[in-house]
Amino acid sequence: MGKKLELKAEKSERIVAFLARKVPGLSGAKANILVRNGEVRINGKRKKTNEVIDAGDSVNVFIPDELQVELPKVKTVYDDENIVVFDKPKRTAYDALPQLYDAPLYSVHRLDTNTTGLIVFAKTEYVQRALAEAFKQRRVQKLYRAVVYPAPEKSEGTLTAYTKLLSDKNLALVSPDSRDGYKTMVTEYKVVERIGGAAVLDVYPHTGRTHQIRAHMSFFGCPIIGEHKYGIKDITPPDGAPDSQMLAAVKLSFSGMKGGLAYLNGMTFETTDNFDLDFLRK
């Protein structure tokens, strides 16, 4: 029977890249086949070439059964009338997760494609606005687990720097000093374990900047193992290190929620990082 999807573009990008990012389990090669076969309509018009779409464009796609799209396994950690909490696997775009659910979901915060762990979606636009404000006011506390190399000298610390996002390159610039157009970012860390010259960290972002933990730890001189965008070229990772970043959102806690979401106060959701550290123990 196949599957019909109605999607909305949030930025300018080519159709194939958009589909591969938004449709769970759909590779770029299979997305290209859909385009060539005329299975994609942009704003109601059939497209057979890999054109650029713009923010706000309506994208309708039909995926026939023969393409055999393999959906990623996504664990639902919590589900009620207002929110759903997923444990996102690696290499799955956060904004593709709503396609796996049987009702509309609204994004509240981001989780990078190669970062695993907990992410919250709202079930109504009202809840989306309330949760977005709660995240902004730090009423939702996030804890990340990361493996960095080399290990920081101090066992704990709070780092402060300034960052500016280059939207066209999806790249966060970092400066030690305040500059025009830069925003403050604050990241707290605590060493959980030192092993093989590396360290397992608990990381608490006190601000919510794009790529904050990845960019900030690298700027601090302790890049995340397997992280390539902000990794330091002069630092060679340990032998056997994985090629994907060792960063996971492992804990979400709610406090100070108001109105119809006050019942979330005191709730905490947790997951494991699933890091394989054997390469550090050799």
Label every PLM stretch briefly:
Residues Y101-A132, L165-F220, L247-K282:
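The conserved catalytic core of RNA pseudouridine synthases
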Residues K48-V52, D202, S244:
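Short, surface-exposed secondary-structure edge patches
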Residues T76, V148, E188-V191, I224:
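Conserved hydrophobic positions within beta-strands
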Residues M1-I33, H206, R214-K282:
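Pseudouridine synthases involved in rRNA/tRNA modification
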Residues N43-T49, G197-V200, P238:
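Short alpha-helix capping/helix-loop boundary micro-motifs
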Residues M1-K169, K183, N274-L280:
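RNA pseudouridine synthases
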